[in-house]
Amino acid sequence: LVDMRALGRELNRLAAVGYKIGVVSWLCKGGQADYNERVTKTKIEWLRKHIGAVEWNEIHIVEYGTPKQKVVDFPDGILFDDEIGNRKNWLGNAFDVDNIIEILKGME
């Protein structure tokens, strides 16, 4: 489990020194349009509730399987993702989400 307050602090610290902060998340596999709309709304509400102090440069909620590097503004940026395939295909540095706080703390 990630400490959302700590995550928010680290994201804001990095944004203050010039990092662009974004989210790219998949919808569920095979979801219908109306269901996907509800899931998108729920994911955005979750971000606002749990790390609402972060000002996102971009948020993309996309169909399952969409190559994440193809829908973001900075495909050579840093990705945290639990899917190994997404990490392998990413054009920049990619990490598992397990140590996100520690990795962010090490960034300047």
PLM regions and their residue ranges:
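Short catalytic helix/loop segments, enriched in acidic residues and glycine
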Residues: 1-4
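Generic hydrophobic alpha-helical segments
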Residues: 10-11, 68, 72, 100-107
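Short catalytic/ligand-binding loop motif for oxyanion handling, primarily in non-cytosolic enzymes
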Residues: 21-23, 29-34, 67-70, 86-89, ...
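A short, structured active-site edge motif that brings together acidic residues
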Residues: 24-28, 40-69
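Conserved Lys-Pro-Asp/Glu-containing loop-to-beta segment of HAD-superfamily phosphomonoesterases
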Residues: 58-85, 90
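Asp-based, Mg2+/Mn2+-dependent phosphohydrolase catalytic module
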Residues: 78, 83-108
